């Protein structure tokens, strides 16, 4: 069954294995399609320019079809299929390490921080990246940024699809995911976190294989903190001219969306 979230009149005959649905949209509109199979839910987020055919994936916690691994800058990353989205299981660890006291610059070299200025921290948790550096100094959503060729940084809306796909109570398209500056959802965070490595009983179930780690952060003053307690993930979407959306997890079941 397909769930239509638009404002145009929609045909009721959508509870079929294949369906053709016509409605008006403007070029540049981002459309969210939600598919259901038994108790499973899957979503596709796209900005179509012509008629499109969408295939919903209901398998999860398996390597992405045809791309089980990605080799990039001397490292091998594993992929994970979570319904209709394909993610890297490991945090990116690419670029040249700079001290926490320094800021990256737009110099055609990817620069990262490693927690406590220890290279082993980047090996374990991935690099810590300032937003502009991660985006490679563009604000365009869907950009490759520091990702491998053919991959892109997830937008705020793509994060919402992931959150709804893995939460047991608030599903894709629920207004719950538009809430900011507070805990959201029911158990999305625990389902995305690793089963070990989090302090204060913060370990997750890793139910979908996302393998979120508590890599900590580097703040504006260059101070490192919260490794083992917090995990932070950027979205490639600006909140305003000074901030961007991000997700972070602590020892709770739900996720915080803030900037």
Write out the residue ranges for each language-model feature.
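Conserved positions within compact, well-structured domain cores
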Residues: 15-18, 59-259
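Tryptophan-paired
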Residues: 1-27
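A short, solvent-exposed beta-strand micro-motif common in secreted/extracellular proteins
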Residues: 24-37
